[in-house]
Amino acid sequence: MMLTSISDILPQCQQESGKTGDRYYAVEPGNEDTLSSFMMIDQGEGQYTLDLWSEAHSNHYWEDRILSILDKITWSSLYATVPASFPWEKLGYRADILAHRYRFFGKLKDVPMPAMPHEDAVWMSAEGQADSLAHLLLASDPTCPGWEAARQAIGDIYQGVYGKLLKGSGLVELEGRKIGGCLLSDEFGSVLLAHIFTIPAAKRQGWARWLAAYGLHRCSSDPDQWIKASLDANNRGSYQLMTALNLQQVPELIHVCRITKESELS
């Protein structure tokens, strides 16, 4: 879809090109401080993903605009990450819920900087460390299907699927062993906590919190820098980490959905 087409619907729309296709982003005028925003990724061949940050009182603003966008594009596959209250049925669509997530946000000035858990540890930039981070991800996440899946997940972040990789991204090494990593992406001016992980032997020692806080403070010196994060609703460890980082939880549960137009259902 052309930027001129979507900007007719979404004032001040921004566009970026990424590995999987163009990204379009807009905020609700006057509601910047609530991060009420919409992002769409055109993945090519009629495949789109939508990501809506909104609260119930903003749904009305986005309903008409999302409906207009979906009427303008030709799509064969549409996935959306939206607040649970978003009224797909009212717009003539069915939403099949695939997963539940929580969202968090805050400003850099709210994130405390803890002491490094071990003074002999060394932080290093993520630059050139994709394979090392993939190994860390595989070791840290028992649900990861395997090496290729870990490489793909890390590679997507490096190649900008979620936005440009930021300089605060890095990993930590202790006694010659890499024990954890944190990857941060630029999402149209906000810092997105794209991935944080530590190996089992380093868990519950404060490393994830330190890596995230250290990385965030390396990204920017602006105390009002926005930070965003999203996590699976069943991920208790990440939930506790968000609390430790002093980020605010978006009150509403988030749905990851597959969207189908009602008229196309048999």
Give each language-model segment a name.
Residues 36, 97-99, 179-180, 208, ...:
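A structural microfeature
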Residues 53-119, 253-259:
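Acyl-donor-binding surface of acyltransferase catalytic domains
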